[in-house]
Every structure is written in C-alpha cells, then in structure tokens.
Amino acid sequence: MLKKLAVCLSIVLLLLGAASPISAHTVYPVNPNAQQTTKDIMNWLAHLPNRSENRVMSGAFGGYSDVTFSMTEENRLKNATGQSPAIYGCDYGRGWLETADITDTIDYCCNSSLISYWKSGGLPQVSLHLANPAFPSGNYKTAISNSQYKNILDPSTVEGKRLEALLSKIADGLTQLKNQGVTVLFRPLHEMNGEWFWWGLTGYNQKDNERISLYKELYKKIYRYMTETRGLDNLLWVYSPDANRDFKTDFYPGSSYVDITGLDAYFTDPYAISGYDEMLSLKKPFAFAETGPSGNIGSFDYAAFINAIRQKYPQTTYFLTWDEQLSPAANQGAQSLYQNSWTLNKGEIWNGGSLTPIAE
C-alpha cells in the first residue's frame, strides 16, 4: 500500500496548530450559519487544487437507501485497490416507487452507515431521485408541463403539499446527520439540463426559458427550506448538470445557493468530457459529482480517467464513480486511480477530530 493513514496522522500531529493558511482567501459555505466543521471542510476542499499532490478526493456510490445501498462498493474497491473512497454516496429518493404515500419513496436508513463512514474518516454525499409531486407517488421520469411545475411550487395546491411532505422527510434524514456532526455534500435536482427527470427539460437539448426559471425557483425553495426553516447547517450544496447536454450553466440558481459546481459525466473518452470550462466560469470548486464509463464497460481503464483529470481537468476536487458494472472495481485501472499521487482516500481528509493540514 503506497499510502498509509499512519503517515497522514503523523503529518497532522506535526502541523496542527502551526499550519499556515494556504492563502489569505478563505472560502466559506453559502450558508453563513454553517457549523464550524462544515466551514472548515469547505475552505479545505476549495484549496485542494493548490496542492502538488493529495488533491482529488475519491468517491463511490453506495446505492439507493433501503433498496440497493450497502457497503459492498467500499469493500469491492478496498479489495481491488487497498483503499476506501474518501466520499461515499447514498440516494434518499426512490422516485420510481408507486406507494400509497409519496413520502414512502424517501428513505434514509443509510444514515447509520454514513455516520460510521464519517467517524472513520469519510465524507458522505446525499442525492435524490425525487418522486414527482404532480402524482400521488413515483413518476420521477414522467415529464410534466410548465403549468404542472407551477402547481408543485404553489404550497396551496395538492402538488405543492406533496412537495412539502417530501422535503420534510428528506430534512428529517439530514437532521439525523446534523445531530451527529456530519457534514454532507448535498446534491438535489441533478442533471436538470437532461430530458429524463421531471424537474428538468422535456426535449433533447431544447431550451425552455420558462422551465429554467421554474427550476431555479424550485432549487431555491429547497435551499431555503433546508437552511432557513429546518436549520440544516451541515450541508455543502452541489450543482451538477449533465455533461452530455447543453445549457449547463443556464439552470444555475446563483452563487448564493451553490457551494460546489460539478458535472455528471458518463463518457467513452475521458479526455473529451464537455463542460469543464463552463463550470469553472461559475467560480466555485469543481467536481465530477457522478461519473463512469458509457462504453467499454468491464474493460474501461480508470487510469486514463485520473490522467485526464491531471492533464485536462486539474481544478477537480473530487470524483464519485457509479457502482456495479461501472465501478472501478469492475473495470481496469482501479489501483492506478486510487493509488495515484493526486488521489485522496478515506482517512486522508478527516480523522474524526481534525482536518489534515493544508500544506503547500
């Protein structure tokens, strides 16, 4: 094993209390009332690209809560690479389920695993394949009209009340993590520039300015509810359009609502991913918030992906690969990805007591 937690902790002991700031510029979360640990992680993450090595956090998707979520993906990666991902993802929203109560599509039983992961040196990402409030449940891929979208945003309608019920249960799950001091990369309403989720576009690369405005209103509504109504001060907000569609920045709700901009990127050639410069133009830390191969599945070489990050996307702060057949463990180059000198793994960012120092 090329990297050992003991080495990292030795550096912590040497530099704690004496580490100078990486620059005079401190990067704060968009929530001014964020808890101190969340502030520390945000500033630390934002300055990762200034390092010469240990600068890109690895990440993996663990599955949908109470359906496919488990620690299997971590175990597969550890067996393949000797390392565990720095970031582990869970999705609270099982938006395809047809249930008697739309809130039954939300589940956060993965929290116990996420809390344990945090305490052992990891960082969780929570995403949402959100059920469609235009219907009693399910239908997360059912297109809706702009009129239906407006009804969802209106708290006096049946649709609006369904949305509020969904948000309340999601917030309950995030509150459990807050109460344990867990900072969360929170990624709602992803891939909005695609035509496959109800909150996004309805046609392939067909721009709809009204739709874009409605999306922004929905995103801000979720932000205000989580931050102001529920007091969730442990969230870092991730905005991640699809790399293979246009209008990546058009849906951007504004710099006051987003901490990290990323891409959901599935590709055959990691050197030809679209949207990197567009995301950088938003002046936020950048990540591949969801990623994996779209071709050569089972034989894709993840060594090429980390090399592409180094050569073409050097401002990347983290990547999160999908699971099952798209996982590095099911393809080639997993060890090259996790053992690369640029890659940060579990235990190398957070030890349950203090962040590793930022050393130039």
Curated annotation (Swiss-Prot):
It comes from the Bacteria. One of its GO terms (molecular function) is mannan endo-1,4-beta-mannosidase activity. The record marks H190 as: Plays an important role in maintaining the position of the catalytic nucleophile. Substrate binds at H129, W196, Y266. One of its GO terms (biological process) is polysaccharide catabolic process. Residues 36-347 form the GH26 domain. It is found in: Secreted. Homodimer. Involved in the degradation of glucomannan. Catalyzes the endo hydrolysis of beta-1,4-linked mannan, galactomannan and glucomannan. This is Mannan endo-1,4-beta-mannosidase.
